[in-house]
Amino acid sequence: MRAVIQRVKAAKVTVLDELVSSIGPGLCVLVGIKASDTAKDVEYLVRKILALRLFEEEGKRWQKSVKDLNLELLCVSQFTLYHRLKGNKPDFLAAMKGEEAQELYNQFLDRLGQSYDSTKIKDGKFGAYMQVHIENDGPVTINLESPEQKDTDREVDK
């Protein structure tokens, strides 16, 4: 599971010119799910995202997390994070397919809400063609990826 995390002053998602979600200061999180991801990957990303110290305190950088400062998160599913180039054309065979990915993505959103504050967690519209408007702060962009699990670990998850 991958996440591209951007510190933002504001962010919003629209679909067909309709506002779906918006946040003020906080994090915009683009989330990619690969075919072999499980609940363990969800737990890892949720824990890391909420603990990342990307915000200042009293002029000192990298001191506070989104949770410490009670800020919002805007999460957007993005299967293109699991691409591979064939020449100049991307393919997305490594990405988890539709319904299964949506289930794991919803699990990710639920766990964020359970581990933090569900009213602070916003998201786009899964599977829709979205416009994501991000007002970067810094800019600060962090890439996270859950560690590969051994095959024996995956068998336990099934």
From Swiss-Prot:
Residue stretches spanning the membrane:
none
Q: Which enzyme class, named as a word?
A: hydrolase
Q: Name one GO cellular component term.
A: cytoplasm
Q: Which InterPro entries match?
A: Daa-tRNA_deacyls_DTD, DTD-like_sf
Q: Tell me which domain of life the UniProt entry assigns to the organism this sequence originates from.
A: Eukaryota
Query: What is this protein for, i.e. what is its function?
Result: An aminoacyl-tRNA editing enzyme that deacylates mischarged D-aminoacyl-tRNAs. Hydrolyzes correctly charged, achiral, glycyl-tRNA(Gly). Deacylates mischarged endogenous and E.coli glycyl-tRNA(Ala), protecting cells against glycine mischarging by AlaRS. Acts via tRNA-based rather than protein-based catalysis; rejects L-amino acids rather than detecting D-amino acids in the active site.
Q: What is the protein's given name?
A: D-aminoacyl-tRNA deacylase
Q: What organism does the UniProt record list as the source?
A: Drosophila melanogaster
